Amino acid sequence: MNMRLLLLLLFGSVVMYTSCQSTSALIDSLAARVTENTSKGQILFRLVTDEADPAKDYFEIDSKDGKVLITGNSDLSLATGLNWYLKYVAGIHLSWNNPSQKLPEVLPLPQKKIRQATAMKNRYYLNYCTYSYSMAFWDWERWEKEIDWMAMHGINMPLSITGMEVVWYNLLKRIGYTTEEINEFISGPAFMAWWQMNNLEGWGGPNPDSWYRQQEALQKKIIARMRELGIEPVFPGYAGMVPRNIGEKLGYQIADPGKWCGFPRPAFLSTEDEHFDSFAAMYYEELEKLYGKAKYYSMDPFHEGGNTEGVDLAKAGTSIMGAMKKANPEAVWVMQAWQANPREAMVNTLDSSDLLVLDLYSEKLPQWGDPESMWYREKGFGKHDWLYCMLLNFGGNVGLHGRMEQLVNGYYNACAHVNGKTLRGVGATPEGIENNPVMFELLYELPWREERFSPDEWLQTYLKARYGNDLSPEVAEAWRALEHTVYNAPKNYQGEGTVESLLCARPGFHLDRTSTWGYAKLF
């Protein structure tokens, strides 16, 4: 054999072996955490590529020498396969209510090889609001559990806004703002979501210096673990937000987006202003110094009714995109489809490969082109890629709620629709989490199930995962009742999330709701 060819083969073998070993160690560690150190020697992981169909992610569950063998094309696929095995072979359901569980001494083996694959390469997670309603004061111990949960559900692009206040702190210091002025702009921890969405400024602050140091260190640990697992964090990009006083203080040309729920919004830096490009560049520089470059940047200019008077939307769109591309030419702009966004005038001139739209409320008010939707857009999102997303939760309110049939049927209808040619995956965009885990299991299995299925049939398999293989008839009957009531909200139900408790309403003699937009009557 040619010596050069022999050396090349040997080198390739070493590289492949090292890659498999490092990946195995990484997923072994995850498996140990979620099984309370009982998976070692019982579950084996193997990373391989599928040369026959490289466009798809996949995993296989099999057995070898009396042990469970999980094969996949990436770390995330292996983690997703682990979760699938635990649910559908071992009868173990890991969720927010039960994030880890010891394995039995003798693990059940699959009766035959299980293989699941998906061409839906994007699986998104989180909403800005989640960071305030559910995550405002999480520490690393809690975040580690959540990242494990993400990996086991195949999530590969979660919104990541922890510690972004440090970016703004450093940026504003750089242009001459005092610490006091900065804290008048940056909101307190419980209101970071609405500050990041350009809805308000300063509310709930000021923040102590220790907060900024703590959140910077926490975010660095979060994104390091995500990137180890092949998860791409979605960072907030620069969409024109500036403090309201920047015109008076520094002479910047700004537009006033008005108020949001009575709160004065931060100003919008005009793209006509000579400072726009330099300010955006400084933002991305400070972001990269702290947390590195991102593949995805989330930006939602004029969120929830922001005033666009005097704004050239087309120029704003190209300027925002241009600033992002200067920071990372390979980056993609992620935008929420919510109410008037995305505005056609802002995105029509953008290249199709540069924007990814989140159809934020696909299970109720889809904008992808469903003619039955109140938010119907005939052309959907046009040439741009998009994700089918489940919103589910509003306000972090806790209660049993879901739209199983609409979620499943809507997804497969979208896949079959002409606008489905640009559908690239799914996402969960809840305002609050740690409730209704059944809906998240259902959502994140959709891309791994190529054929349309019945929610009723799926629920029977889910219940065995949740309660074990010895499912009692009483439990099954109770869940059938839930499936056809609270987990099958009718299309004409206009409430935001779960029905409300009248105990939370203002006193009155004829109450039927707590909020003006909600309902207390169960369907």
Q: Model-derived features: where do they sit?
A:
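Bacterial Sec-dependent N-terminal signal peptides
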Residues: 1-25
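Contiguous, structured surface segment used for ligand recognition
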Residues: 20-120
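Stable alpha-helical elements in mature extracytoplasmic
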Residues: 23-30, 78, 82, 142-146, ...
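Second-shell loop/turn segments in exported
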Residues: 67-72, 131-137, 209-210
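Catalytic-core regions of glycoside hydrolase
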Residues: 93, 97-107, 126-130, 151, ...
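Active-site-adjacent substrate/metal-binding segments within catalytic domains
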Residues: 120-139, 150
